[in-house]
Every structure is written in structure tokens, then in C-alpha cells.
Amino acid sequence: MLRYLTAGESHGRGLSVIVEGLPAGVPLTDGDINTWLTRRQGGYGRGGRMAIERDQAEILAGVRGGLTLGSPIALFIANRDWENWQEIMAPGPEARAARVVTRPRPGHADLAGGLKYHQADLRNILERASARETAARVAAGAVAAVLLKELAIELAFHVVRIGPVEVREQVDWEAACRAVESPVYCADPEAGRAMVAAIEEARQQGDTLGGVVEVLARGVPAGLGSHVHWDRRLDGRLAQALMSIPAIKGVEIGAGFRVAALPGSRAHDAIAYRKGQGFYHPTNRAGGLEGGLTNGETLVLRAAMKPIPTLMHPLPSVDLVTKQPATASIERSDVCAVPAAAVVAAAAVAWVLAGAILEQFGGDYLPVIQERLAAYRQYLQEI
């Protein structure tokens, strides 16, 4: 079973990640992870925190000589901003009670978390609820992506909407791969420029913008997941992974919500067969998933991100101590983090797919898994 745990606060010493269940023999270096972390920090619209941090993952355990050992992998990402916060965020009793937060921000975990955990200082909630934690998720997803690459499964991501600006044409694989060259990870240059302008306008108004990201995965064989039980359906597992990303409020697979307006004759994908290729679908409205299983086509998933709720012109709130009306507190934040969310979403998809592969084919050593997957792919072509 592939799983990971993360620990760490936004302004703590750093973020820790434990990855368990990765087979032995997978080539893995710091650089494989740091490429993903750098992309997560990129994207037009990020705030001052990204000017401080230079995320670099350090592999502490589970890898020797550039190859995984099959034992748990330990990763650490230092927070450079810790220098400015160590007196406040120290784990010991010497921690100084400063920068106390008592005015919860609408749209954040502040109020609900404070009520659940009986915290008067909402910093004890927001530090962990912060999207800073997604750096650890991306590190785990990057490890999974390395395994997928060794199994000839590739990932791409791009931004399809920021605020009012939308990419209206379908983006092909090559264009999606080039999207990282855009300051907003948009595959359409004209739309990308309009997105930058929209972000700048929101910045000047003290506002924030959300958007929609798309993740593609190709080389995924048919049959991953299962129709047998609700919790084994791969579409459900992918949706849960995407919905768990902070600020994500909706997920689409394939044509998504658009199929609700179509008759069945136009909503589904016909089945075809070609000798040497096997069964395939000439169209891909299903987004590569049918009945809880992959169907052999490219996976297409979208996630909708709400605007960041930390505002320079805060919304009305109530002070937890005085119970009096107040404006919400302000924390350092971004104007738009949609490009970063695209990277986090791709990492989440990579993690779920890697787990599904290991469940399907088993094996504790990479060459064994490669051999089993190759035999299965041959079966799909020759059936």
C-alpha cells in the first residue's frame, strides 16, 4: 500500500514527509523533487512569501546510491522564513505569545478549526491549514511521478481559467506540456497575457482571483481501479485527492458538468477495435474513466479553485475574545495561486495513479513491476 504523511506548520522549522510503499530500485534524486517544488512556487500572482522561500527537498532516508531501497522515504523541506518566526513558533514553552489571531477570516479554516480544537489563538489553526503544506504534498507526488515515468506514464498540467479569462479551445498534449513556459502556466499565449492583466487588476484593487486547472495523464492502461466497491472506484479516489487541496471547490472528469446538458447519444464515447492496438475510443468525453476504472484513454481532470479568501480589504468577522463585530485578520498571501494549484493537482493525480498501479500489479522491485505491466499491456493489445 502506497501512503504518505506530512507534518509541519507554515512558519515552523520546515515540512516533513514520509513516503511508504514505494518499491526498491526506483531512481530518485533531490532534483526530481525540486523541479516540482520550483514549479509550485512559480506562477504570476504569488505573494511575498515566495520571494523568501527557495524550496529544496532533502532526502533523509529510504534512498541509497540514487535508488530507492523499498523502505520508508523521509523528506524535509526547510522554511527559510523560520528565522523570522522562531521565537513565536518554537515548540517549547519559551514560545512568545505574539501575532495572536482572534479575528477569523471568512473562507478559511480559522473559525471552524478554532471551535473544534478549542483554540483562542487561531494561529494554531491557520499555520497547519495554510496552503504551505501543499509543498509537502507536491514532494510526495513528485516521488510518485518518478515511478510513473519509469512505467511510461506521463503527466501534464495547465491553467484553463483565471477569473474571467478562459481558454476556450481544447488543449492537446504537446501544448499542455509547453504551458510551464507561460507565467501563468497557460497553453494559450493570448489567454495567458489576459490572465496576467486580470491578476494585476485584482492586485491593484486589493482583491484575489480563482480559476480552473487541468491535469492530463497518458500511457495509463485500461483497468486501473474497480467497479466492485465504492472506495475502489478510481474516479472517486482522484476526485477526493483533488478536492483535498486547499481552496478547491469542484472537480470535473472529461466533459464533466457539460454532459448534464447533453442527450446520451452525444455524451458517451463509442468503442472501436484495431488489430495490434486493441479496444479504444475515438472520442474521450469520459476523460479516460468509465465505471470507476481507467479505459485506456488519456485521463482528463479539472479542478476549480476559489479566490484566496485572505483579502487586503477584509470581510466582516467577529472577534473570538470580545464577541464584537470586527474585520477579518490579514495574513501575508497571494493574489492568485491558480498556477501553483495546477502543480499541486498534478502531484495529487500522480500519487493516486501510482497507488493504483501498485495495487494492480504488486511487486517490491521496479523491474518486476515493469515486467508485469508490460505483459498486461501486451494482453490489452492482442486480446
Swiss-Prot record:
Cofactor: FMNH2
Pfam families linked to this entry: Chorismate_synt (PF01264)
InterPro entries xref list: Chorismate_synth (IPR000453), Chorismate_synth_AroC_sf (IPR035904), Chorismate_synthase_CS (IPR020541)
EC number: 4.2.3.5
Top-rank taxon, per record: Bacteria
Catalytic activities: 5-O-(1-carboxyvinyl)-3-phosphoshikimate = chorismate + phosphate
Example GO molecular function: FMN binding
UniProt entry keywords in alphabetical sequence: Amino-acid biosynthesis, Aromatic amino acid biosynthesis, FAD, Flavoprotein, FMN, Lyase, NADP
Entry binding sites for NADP(+): 40, 46
Pathway: Metabolic intermediate biosynthesis; chorismate biosynthesis; chorismate from D-erythrose 4-phosphate and phosphoenolpyruvate: step 7/7
GO-annotated biological processes: amino acid biosynthetic process; aromatic amino acid family biosynthetic process; chorismate biosynthetic process
Any one GO CC term of the record: cytosol
Cofactor binding notes: Reduced FMN (FMNH(2)).
Residues where FMN binds: 128-130, 291, 306-310, 332
Similarity annotation: Belongs to the chorismate synthase family.
Chain's role: This reaction introduces a second double bond into the aromatic ring system.
Summary of subunit composition and partner proteins: Homotetramer.
Name under which the protein is recorded: Chorismate synthase
Organism: Moorella thermoacetica (strain ATCC 39073 / JCM 9320)
Lineage, uppermost ranks: Bacteria, Bacillati, Bacillota, Clostridia, Moorellales
Gene: aroC
